[in-house]
């Protein structure tokens, strides 16, 4: 392949790995991911529209439902309104059907996690 074994690409990869290790990003992702999942699960007990919260590390999904018993998916209109409110708060999530996918950067701070959870809470509060 054209760039296989290219020394410039290899040097860039090694530098990226060095920076990842220097910043201890794996440990940060584990700690912030635990905070994110805790915050999202607290929102689940507050908002009936949250049918489920799933996550591992810094990747999480929030399922939106009309009824928590039947798990009927929330309508596109409701998802869109919540999504717009979250974005207006300065937080980007990915809407995928009736799910919000949250996958922040590995360098996220505790304050950023709080901002994400607060923005999502505001989004759900409009319903």
Tell where the protein language model's regions lie, with residue ranges.
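Conserved N-terminal phosphate-binding loop of PLP-dependent enzymes in the Aspartate aminotransferase
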Residues: 1-127
């Amino acid at each position: 392949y054209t760039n296989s074994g290219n020394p410039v690409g290899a040097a860039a990869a090694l530098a990226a790995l060095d920076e990842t290790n220097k910043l201890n990003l794996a440990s940060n992702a584990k700690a912030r991911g635990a905070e994110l999942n805790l915050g999202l699960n607290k929102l689940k007990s507050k908002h009936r529209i949250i049918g489920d919260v799933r996550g591992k590390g810094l990747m999480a999904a929030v399922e939106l439902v009309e009824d928590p018993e039947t798990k009927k998916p929330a309508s596109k209109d409701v998802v869109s309104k919540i999504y717009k409110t979250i974005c207006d708060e300065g937080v980007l999530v990915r809407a995928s059907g009736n799910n919000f996918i949250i996958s922040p950067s590995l360098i996220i701070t505790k304050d950023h996690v709080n901002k994400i959870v607060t923005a999502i809470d505001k989004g759900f509060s409009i319903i």
